[in-house]
């Protein structure tokens, strides 16, 4: 194990000098600095650049407080390695694979795997197309998720990305019994803490491994924590042959941390100040998230859109890798429609007759047509009023409003805020409900009966309570 000495510390960047004759560490190797002689507390550094003359530049995974020039640095000879396997379920980790849930730490002989790996080869990939039922009407009907696909949840600040992710974890664990890996990348510690306790209360935690690199942590940790979560998910896919759900909240913070690291390493910035290696870094992460012949990793990634600008390089680069996009719209939040999924902007490769079936495809297409026409008529209504519309258009507007409200539903994970029980709606029920609304079967029911309910039976029950 070769050793060097700290030459300089600039925030999270640490330069290490290896003496002549010492073997230089490879790029991405983990180096360790012990803060005191007892060797109880250590700081892990990851090699980022070789500067020449025995000097390497590293990025710290923890705060560099207390580091001084001349301290000894040891090369571990391998990348950061994290625990994998069934023992990780129900536990909470940091970027280094250390437990942070105040329960017993993992032993040294626990199975570990390096976080840097190659993506599966072409002949290992699976090509089947199967729908993953989420129980959320707007998603299942208009932008269904593929098993083993990549889904992006797009939206600005405060439109409900994290709540939607929590509901997906809840539904998939309760209805499908699947394993989930939740990776918190650069988000609020409070949200991570709330999620942990909610999952513990609902019993979902037993099927979930959680990895966090939160907002207050150095950029190195925020940049690598997504790889830590992915490594745990890959083990369940490749060794256990499982179908795994990988949640990343928020993939924008991964890019943001990469931008910070790039600037600290002295690279010339690219468009909008992002790192020149943006597309490469995103590709290296996304190409590992895939389905193989052994199992699948379905990833659901929350993507913060800076200032609601979809042309920003960070969300635009993520777009290229996705099978489905779920766009959250602030205007729907203002109308009180939750989840605030934009039915016209959201899309999915899976919405094809050969995958979802002819009836589902036809109903989804008609729902989109009605909503699009309503969207076009809104200007006329705003200027001239409803009276200027033809009878046919008035009927279409009435149905479109019912559809818009019926696309909302109460979530199980939001019950404590709304006071309303959540609902899980199977795909067949969803398709039937919308087909009957389009056929005019419920034109006599009030619009409010369609808001925040589950199946069409719930609409009828709500209308009866209202006296209809």
Swiss-Prot record:
Record-listed ATP binding positions: 155-162
Keywords (A to Z) from UniProt: ATP synthesis, ATP-binding, Cell membrane, CF(1), Hydrogen ion transport, Ion transport, Membrane, Nucleotide-binding, Translocase, Transport
Pfam families: ATP-synt_ab, ATP-synt_ab_N, ATP-synt_VA_C
Alphabetical list of Gene3D superfamilies matching this protein: 2.40.10.170, Bovine Mitochondrial F1-atpase, Atp Synthase Beta Chain, Chain D, domain 3, P-loop containing nucleotide triphosphate hydrolases
GO cellular component, one term: proton-transporting ATP synthase complex
Matching SUPFAM superfamilies: C-terminal domain of alpha and beta subunits of F1 ATP synthase (SSF47917), N-terminal domain of alpha and beta subunits of F1 ATP synthase (SSF50615), P-loop containing nucleoside triphosphate hydrolases (SSF52540)
InterPro entries per the UniProt record, alphabetical: AAA+_ATPase, ATP-synt_VA_C, ATP_synth_F1_bsu, ATPase_a/bsu_AS, ATPase_alpha/beta_chains, ATPase_F1/V1/A1_a/bsu_N, ATPase_F1/V1/A1_a/bsu_N_sf, ATPase_F1/V1/A1_a/bsu_nucl-bd
Membrane topology listed for this record: Peripheral membrane protein
One of the record's GO molecular function terms: ATP binding
Entry's EC annotation: 7.1.2.2
NCBIfam families reported for this sequence: atpD (TIGR01039)
Subunit structure comment from the entry: F-type ATPases have 2 components, CF(1) - the catalytic core - and CF(0) - the membrane proton channel. CF(1) has five subunits: alpha(3), beta(3), gamma(1), delta(1), epsilon(1). CF(0) has three main subunits: a(1), b(2) and c(9-12). The alpha and beta chains form an alternating ring which encloses part of the gamma chain. CF(1) is attached to CF(0) by a central stalk formed by the gamma and epsilon chains, while a peripheral stalk is formed by the delta and b chains.
Stated role: Produces ATP from ADP in the presence of a proton gradient across the membrane. The catalytic sites are hosted primarily by the beta subunits.
Record-given protein name: ATP synthase subunit beta
Lineage, opening ranks: Bacteria, Bacillati, Bacillota, Bacilli, Lactobacillales
């Amino acid at each position: 194990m070769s050793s060097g000495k700290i030459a300089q510390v600039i925030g999270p960047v640490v330069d290490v000098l290896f003496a002549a004759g010492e073997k230089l560490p490879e790029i991405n190797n983990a180096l360790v600095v012990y803060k005191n002689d007892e060797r109880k507390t250590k700081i892990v550094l990851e090699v980022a650049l070789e500067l020449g003359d025995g000097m390497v530049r590293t990025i710290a995974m923890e705060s560099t407080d207390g580091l001084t020039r001349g301290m000894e640095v040891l090369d571990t000879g391998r990348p950061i390695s994290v625990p994998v396997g069934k023992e990780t379920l129900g536990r909470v980790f940091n970027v280094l694979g250390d437990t942070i849930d105040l329960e017993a730490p993992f032993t040294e002989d626990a199975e570990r795997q390096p976080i840097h790996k190659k993506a599966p080869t072409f002949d290992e990939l699976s090509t089947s197309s199967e729908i993953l039922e989420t129980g959320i009407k707007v998603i299942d009907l208009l932008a269904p998720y593929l098993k083993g696909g990549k889904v992006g949840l797009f939206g600005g600040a405060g439109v409900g990305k994290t709540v939607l992710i929590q509901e997906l974890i809840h539904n998939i664990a309760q209805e499908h019994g699947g394993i989930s890996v939740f990776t918190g990348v650069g988000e609020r510690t409070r949200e991570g803490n709330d999620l942990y306790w909610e999952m513990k209360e609902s019993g979902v935690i037993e099927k979930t491994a959680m990895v966090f690199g939160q907002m207050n942590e150095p950029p190195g940790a925020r940049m690598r924590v997504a790889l830590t979560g992915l490594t745990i998910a890959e083990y369940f896919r490749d060794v256990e042959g499982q179908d795994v759900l990988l949640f990343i909240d928020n993939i924008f913070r991964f890019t943001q941390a990469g931008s910070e690291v790039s600037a600290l390493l002295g690279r010339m910035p690219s468009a909008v100040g992002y790192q020149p290696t943006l597309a490469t870094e995103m590709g290296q992460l996304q190409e590992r998230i895939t389905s193989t012949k052994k199992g699948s990793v379905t990833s659901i990634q929350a993507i913060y859109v800076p200032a609601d600008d979809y042309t920003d390089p960070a969300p635009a680069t993520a777009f290229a890798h996705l099978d489905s996009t779920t766009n959250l719209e602030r205007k729907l939040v203002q109308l009180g429609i939750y989840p605030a999924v934009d039915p016209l902007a959201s899309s999915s490769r899976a919405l094809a007759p050969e995958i979802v079936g002819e009836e589902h495809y036809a109903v989804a297409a008609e729902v989109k047509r009605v909503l699009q026409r309503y969207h076009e008529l809104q200007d006329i209504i705003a200027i001239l009023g409803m009276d200027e519309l033809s009878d046919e258009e008035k009927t279409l507007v009435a149905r479109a409003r019912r559809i818009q409200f019926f696309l909302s539903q109460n979530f199980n994970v939001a019950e404590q805020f709304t006071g309303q029980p959540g609902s899980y709606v199977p795909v067949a029920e969803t398709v039937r409900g919308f087909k009957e609304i389009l056929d005019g079967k419920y034109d006599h029911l009030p619009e409010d009966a369609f808001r925040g309910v589950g199946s069409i039976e719930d609409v009828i029950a709500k209308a009866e309570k209202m006296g209809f």
